Amino acid sequence: MPKINIVKSGVGNIGSIVRVLDDLNYKYKIINSPEDFSDTKKIILPGVGSFDPFINSLKSKNLFEVIKELVLKKKYSILGICVGMQSLFLESEEGLLPGFGFLNYKCEKFKSDKYKVPHIGWNKIFIKRKNFLFDEIEDKFFYFAHSYTVLAPTKEFTISTTNYTEDFSSAVCNDNVYGVQFHPEKSFDQGKQIIKNFIEKC
């Protein structure tokens, strides 16, 4: 039986996620349609690019409402990555479409004349609230690539922050909903540990 469902939105490449799971010897199910979901109540939702195309891609495959129902009613745990994390919120300044609304906040664009946007490269996370996602992680540097973010460093759902122009939420959690703005699949051993922790401890 698969240990995890990986949503293939059609926007972005899931190859890096698959390689990490192969390295960790986890069985997984790639989700292209609602019928593909296994009974394993864990979902990874990776995403890159822009907000609206990402949401539209999920809707075109009839995945958006199904994911919403699985998370809210059947209590599947979900880990959103990059744009996947942003989609967990109400909306984004980048687009017009609503997100899943699992988290009551919106995504905003970095605003700075001193820093280059997008924020691309390695940056440090500062853990604000104990969470199993960070268990056994010593190196706190992760790889980021984004122009929009969640500027809510003091909100209860924020479990780690990072500074780029200002503090932002680099990892979030509320009940069975988890999100990371960085790319764990591109962050070497510490990123692998994030994915392992989600699968094993969620």
Q: Which residues make up each language-model segment?
A:
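Pocket-forming structural segment of enzyme catalytic cores
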Residues: 90-165
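Short acidic low-complexity segments
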Residues: 27-39
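Extreme N-terminal starter segment of soluble prokaryotic enzymes
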Residues: 1-5
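Cysteine-nucleophile active-site neighborhood
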Residues: 49-119
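Acyltransferase
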Residues: 180-202
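Short, Asp-centered acidic motifs that coordinate Mg2+ and/or phosphate
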Residues: 42
